[in-house]
């Protein structure tokens, strides 16, 4: 399964919970959230566009850092 790394503007536990919520709702993903470094690593067959769109539902600034 491809692994992708994203930067997400998370400042607190609530922010990371929002990321977890939208990714779990999408399904078909395994992910690790690195709150101090504001990064999310996602293992998924979904396209980068779908993952970006999903992460943007949190209302946070999101950018794709590349394959991990």
Swiss-Prot record:
Homodimer. Interacts with ATP7B. Interacts with ATP7A. Interacts (via dimer form) with SLC31A1 (via C-terminal domain); this interaction improves ATOX1 stability and controls intracellular Cu(I) levels. Keywords: Acetylation, Chaperone, Copper, Copper transport, Ion transport, Metal-binding, Phosphoprotein, Transport. One of its GO terms (biological process) is copper ion transport. This is Copper transport protein ATOX1. Residues 1-63 form the HMA domain. The modification N6-acetyllysine is found at residue 60. One of its GO terms (molecular function) is copper chaperone activity. Belongs to the ATX1 family. It comes from Canis lupus familiaris (Dog). Binds and deliver cytosolic copper to the copper ATPase proteins. May be important in cellular antioxidant defense. PROSITE patterns: HMA_1, HMA_2. One of its GO terms (cellular component) is cytosol. It comes from the Eukaryota. The modification Phosphoserine is found at residue 47. Cu cation binds at residues 12, 15. The heavy-metal-associated domain (HMA) coordinates a Cu(+) ion via the cysteine residues within the CXXC motif. The transfer of Cu(+) ion from ATOX1 to ATP7A involves the formation of a three-coordinate Cu(+)-bridged heterodimer where the metal is shared between the two metal binding sites of ATOX1 and ATP7A. The Cu(+) ion appears to switch between two coordination modes, forming two links with one protein and one with the other. Cisplatin, a chemotherapeutic drug, can bind the CXXC motif and hinder the release of Cu(+) ion.
């Amino acid at each position: 399964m491809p692994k992708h790394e994203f930067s997400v503007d998370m400042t607190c536990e609530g922010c990371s919970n929002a990321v977890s919520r939208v990714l779990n709702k999408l399904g078909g993903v395994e992910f690790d959230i690195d709150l101090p470094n504001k990064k999310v690593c996602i293992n998924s067959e979904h396209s980068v566009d779908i993952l970006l769109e999903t992460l943007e539902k949190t209302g946070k600034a999101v950018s794709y850092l590349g394959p991990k």
